[in-house]
Amino acid sequence: MNTTATQLVPAAALPKQLLRDMRAAQHRIWLQAMEFHSEGPAMQALLEAACAAAARGVKVRLVCDPHSYANQPSIGRVVRQLQRAGVAVDWCGHGWWGWPVAGRSHVKIYCCDDTVYLGGGVNFSQASFANHDFMLRYRSAEVANRALGAAHNLYSWWARPDYAVAVSATDTLLADGGTRGQSIILEQACALVRNAKRVWYVSQFAPSGRLASLLRRSQAEVVAFNTARTATSLLDAVGYRALNYRFQAHNQYLGDRKIHAKYIVAEQADGRLVSLTGSHNFNATGVRFGTQETAILTHDQSLGQQLISYARQLV
């Protein structure tokens, strides 16, 4: 598989980099995230670029979870404007009627021709660009095609099987299809921590269940997740208190900026690094609700070192 070096793009730098890629695109643009909010200067520039690309014949598709309708009265008007400009807008997820947090699509994939962003948690919104977060940028037709294949496979009102597919010589894309109680990503996280000599853990939420037990017994160099202090809404504050309190004594994060990155780096007995990074928060709550997720399992040593440096900067 031919691929260039993977680039870690911080959330703050993503709008400008993605905008350049969108403006250069000649064939396809795929923008997928759980949350889509159109307000803000960076988002306005990105949406204008999407419309301009559609006008020059590029196939442009925006895919997001219906959760985006929450607290955003103008979204119907924005969607109609995008559709009139030639941008296809689709809604994904497989929610259960009457239970709004179930069956959500938490996937983040951005693709412009053969450049694709994976393995991070950045939503398609102005507020998301201010979080501690990132995306991994690949420049490879093979990686882009396989990532979009995964996106199409997950695009269903019904839960899909979990699966894994190699996207490069060092990287494998893992996908949770949304079956309640089942997560190939969480299983892989447990396997990494169980066999690790040292561990670096960063997430929006504390680990739970078996992963939490394994992490307590591991040599954890960095453990960083949010507290109620970093909450940007009442719902966030309640969620952090409810999901993080049992593991709070192990938390090393003292900052005020929201952590939205989600990854684990595990040092093996031979000193090599294996990393797992993506949209999964490593908390079993989303698994019980049947959330669709994607993550990258990578043996790239340079990327592993970048992720360790990122974790150290948080504490």
Regions found by a protein language model. Give the residues of each.
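Charged, low-complexity intrinsically disordered terminal segments
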Residues: 1-90, 96-315
